[in-house]
Amino acid sequence: MSQITDVYAREILDSRGNPTLEVEVFLESGAMGRAAVPSGASTGEREALELRDGDKGRYLGKGVLKAVANVNDIIADEVIGMEATDQVGIDRKMLDLDGTEYKSKLGANAILGVSLAVAKAAADEVGLSLYQYIGGSNAKELPLPMMNIINGGAHADNNVDIQEFMIMPAGAKNFAEALRMGAEIFHALKAVLKAKGYNTAVGDEGGFAPNLKSNEEALQVIMEAITKAGFKPGEDVLLALDVASSELFKDGVYTLENEAQPQKTADQLIDFYENLVNKYPIISIEDGMAENDWDGWKKMTERLGKRIQIVGDDLFVTNPRILKEGIDKGIANSILIKLNQIGTLTETLDAIEMAKRAGYTTVISHRSGETEDTTLADLSVAVNAGQIKTGSLCRTDRVCKYNQLLRIEDELDAVALFRGKEVFYNLKK
């Protein structure tokens, strides 16, 4: 009864008004799964290929009708008749059908849409929530959220170099309390920014995007907001950064335009981070070095890797092969997991398993171009990741993931687990 009878893709819009792909998979029993594919702004060069049409006369060249056609005309014929519960088999079938390293023939967006819709259809078939279907009976840990409350870099039209300034309500007793704390700090930050005469418009991920005097001022106003909301920085709430350094790196030099000394070598940039870590309760830095600056990554890991979580995003692009190379070289101690960087659920789960075995933490992440799809919320609980990064406390494309986690926490009830500060097991070596 779990045989696939139909697969259908359509073009929809993401949170930035750009086209993306939505896929529906129907089963013989009448069960159905629907999945929408996200899209990134700052992307790693080794990410799986997001197939766009390139027709400048339509959606400025960003249409995805080619990917839609690849699902409806090519992939559908191959997977119809297969059992939806055979996730690995279906994903392998699509990988073989594409035959390229970065899924450039069919498009990672086409493949991922089908992969996730299949999992959702199978979950619907057996009457389980998606997190239960993927994770089994041991899926019970609600993630500590990284909440992006000030946006900069490629995610905002302002003068802030660092792409994301985040809060982590690590002192919360459960996910619902963590969400409340984050929301209260978000509103306090708006008041702090207004009082200083700063713009309170928001960026792609729902965080505020003011022009500030320096990158450090972003940390200062966040600290003020945490205190204003009635919480203690470093005790109730920790800080995290996503620098997106590949966007700042050219000809062996990092350029932070909003700093007194804009151009920095890798060593000088690590000095900059170390100074911030000494002054503020920063627990995590993502993409602190450019994706191809492996020497810089090694130095940063050696200097800061026992004090803070060092997350590889553009560095690893959710790719098990690249992650293994990083593990072997002792680079970073955490991986950001983005479904569309690798393009199938199976490969995503492989990367998570590899990271955990190596003692690396995993952070399940959204993209800056999101939809109302809440798969990543379920995924974070399914694999007991312990951390999730899904934007600020406004914009429905971000909040829908938080709301799904509230539902899951309710459903798990007494068996729900929330570890708070204990999620940073990579710092206990």
UniProtKB/Swiss-Prot annotation:
Pathway terms, separated by semicolons: Carbohydrate degradation; glycolysis; pyruvate from D-glyceraldehyde 3-phosphate: step 4/5
SUPFAM superfamilies per the UniProt record, alphabetical: Enolase C-terminal domain-like, Enolase N-terminal domain-like
GO CC annotation: cell surface; extracellular region; phosphopyruvate hydratase complex
E.C. no: 4.2.1.11
A biological process from GO: glycolytic process
Entry GO MF terms: magnesium ion binding; phosphopyruvate hydratase activity
Cofactor: Mg(2+)
Subcellular location as annotated: Cytoplasm; Secreted; Cell surface
One Pfam entry name: Enolase_N
Catalytic activity: (2R)-2-phosphoglycerate = phosphoenolpyruvate + H2O
InterPro entries: Enolase, Enolase-like_C_sf, Enolase-like_N, Enolase_C, Enolase_CS, Enolase_N
Enzyme class, broadest EC rank: lyase
Binding site for (2R)-2-phosphoglycerate: 163, 338, 367-368, 389
Binding site for Mg(2+): 242, 286, 313
Family matches, as PROSITE patterns: ENOLASE (PS00164)
Keyword line: Cytoplasm, Glycolysis, Lyase, Magnesium, Metal-binding, Secreted
Annotated catalytic residues: 205 (proton donor), 338 (proton acceptor)
Similarity annotation: Belongs to the enolase family.
Physiological role: Catalyzes the reversible conversion of 2-phosphoglycerate (2-PG) into phosphoenolpyruvate (PEP). It is essential for the degradation of carbohydrates via glycolysis.
Name this polypeptide is given: Enolase
Source organism per UniProt: Geotalea uraniireducens (strain Rf4)
Encoding gene per record: eno
